[in-house]
Amino acid sequence: MAPARLFALLLLFVGGVAESIRETEVIDPQDLLEGRYFSGALPDDEDVVGPGQESDDFELSGSGDLDDLEDSIIGPEVIHPLVPLDNHIPERAGSGSQVPTEPKKLEENEVIPKRISPIEESEDVSNKVSMSSTVQGSNIFERTEVLAALIVGGIVGILFAVFLILLLMYRMKKKDEGSYDLGKKPIYKKAPTNEFYA
């Protein structure tokens, strides 16, 4: 029981350490609201040196030598995009895709579905929808998708049955070889459990 308690204590300790590490990695939301950092423009170790200076120009020997450079740190430049960030799409003044209003152009633009007679002007257009479930006189086996699904399903079913029969034959053959022979005498003989009362 002691190893289980030790393991639980270790898990709690690791969870606490991970939570404290996660709290130190959080960026202050005020910095994001002020616009200091944009996507990918977070400060880097290379940003410590000023513009026009290389990190090799300074001769530093330890961790305390960078304290003098903190006053000269310049933040990243804010780049304003040239394209406005709104979603407004300007209207084109030229002749783009316009909806025809003349009846002759509308008739030329009509799409007539197959298996349906051309639409007469006196009939209701909404009732002329061709659906596969409403087509009369068609056999379900005429469709290639249904036929392909039946063939593949039949092949998979036959293979499953063959493998099941082979598994049963293998187990029966294994029993015939004697690998499951229970008639052997055990090596260890159980001692008699006679109780004596005094």
Swiss-Prot record:
List the transmembrane segments. Answer: 146-170
Question: Which N-terminal stretch is annotated as signal sequence?
Answer: 1-18
Q: Which PANTHER family match?
A: SYNDECAN, SYNDECAN-4
Q: Where in the cell is it found?
A: Membrane; Secreted
Give the record's glycosylation annotations as residue positions: 39, 61, 63, 95
Q: How does it sit in the membrane?
A: Single-pass type I membrane protein
Side Cytoplasmic, residues: 171-198
Q: Which InterPro entries match?
A: Neurexin-like, Syndecan, Syndecan/Neurexin_dom, Syndecan_CS
Q: Name one GO biological process term.
A: cell migration
Q: Which PROSITE patterns match?
A: SYNDECAN
Q: Which UniProt keywords apply?
A: Glycoprotein, Heparan sulfate, Membrane, Proteoglycan, Secreted, Signal, Transmembrane, Transmembrane helix
Q: Name one Pfam family in it.
A: Syndecan
Ranges per topology, Extracellular? 19-145
Protein name in UniProt: Syndecan-4
Q: Which gene encodes it?
A: SDC4
By sequence similarity, the record places it as follows: Belongs to the syndecan proteoglycan family.
Modification after translation: Shedding is enhanced by a number of factors such as heparanase, thrombin or EGF. Also by stress and wound healing. PMA-mediated shedding is inhibited by TIMP3. O-glycosylated; contains both chondroitin sulfate and heparan sulfate. Ser-39, Ser-61 and Ser-63 can all be modified by either chondroitin sulfate or heparan sulfate, and the protein exists in forms that contain only chondroitin sulfate, only heparan sulfate and both chondroitin sulfate and heparan sulfate.
What is any one of the record's Gene Ontology cellular component terms?
extracellular region
Q: What does this protein do?
A: Cell surface proteoglycan which regulates exosome biogenesis in concert with SDCBP and PDCD6IP.
Q: Which organism is it from?
A: Pongo abelii (Sumatran orangutan)
Q: How does it assemble?
A: Homodimer. Interacts with CDCP1 and SDCBP. Interacts (via its cytoplasmic domain) with GIPC (via its PDZ domain). Interacts (via its cytoplasmic domain) with NUDT16L1. Interacts with DNM2; this interaction is markedly enhanced at focal ahesion site upon induction of focal adhesions and stress-fiber formation.
